[in-house]
Amino acid sequence: MAYSRLVRSLGSLLGRQHPHKMGVTRDMVVALLRYKPKNLVEFRNKLATCTLCIGCMRPGEGAQATSCNLQFDSDFLKGLPAYKDCSSLVVNKRKQDQERKGHWMRFGKSTDPELDLNFQLGLFMDLALTRPSPACAAHQLRGKRCLTCPPLFPKLHKGPGGAWTLHPDPVPSPACVSAMVTAALRMIGVDTAAFSGVCCRMGGLTVATEAGVPETILWMQSGHAQDRAARRYVRLTNPDRLYDTWRAFRL
């Protein structure tokens, strides 16, 4: 006990080295998308990890996401037929937002059906009964979390018959979403000692940067990068460049 107190005292004075973290890689995302979940919890965990990684999201942003934030065929319904079966995920508020509130991440349609994140997210909503509520009023909230629709990655518990169902309080905490990430990585045999929820954003930005996605696009999609005055005035004439972050994963 005396030794433990001494170590804690020295730690408070000298500080502690920040634990090394590794980013979630493209190969891990591919393995998770191909993974056949044994139950609804595994399905949720793998989709949360893939979505956060491709969207370069923080655990807190995943915790705040509701089912109505995921909009299927959003660009297609705007009159752009090339984007059929694609989707947009709205993050209402991101850290250090400048000149706009929130981001719209894009997820394209994969050439390999097993790697189609959009289809799997829709299937999970059907199985978990988390489709957006008909009474959804998110468009009236202007950047606030919808209180009517279920969370995109809800807490689950076992119902009377032993089946996984929505928890009475289904909204997850950031720590809960982080636990989903590490649980998903363990499913594909990853030692999670150097992983946590923040590793999704770290990995997504790494994959995108290595693929040559410009910083301006990363700024528009993830809020990452130093602010440059010109970016505030950019108004893209079509959403194609906003799919670059998703394309970096070659799904």
Label for each model-derived stretch:
Residues 1-251:
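Extended, non-catalytic subsegments within catalytic or DNA/protein-binding/adaptor domains
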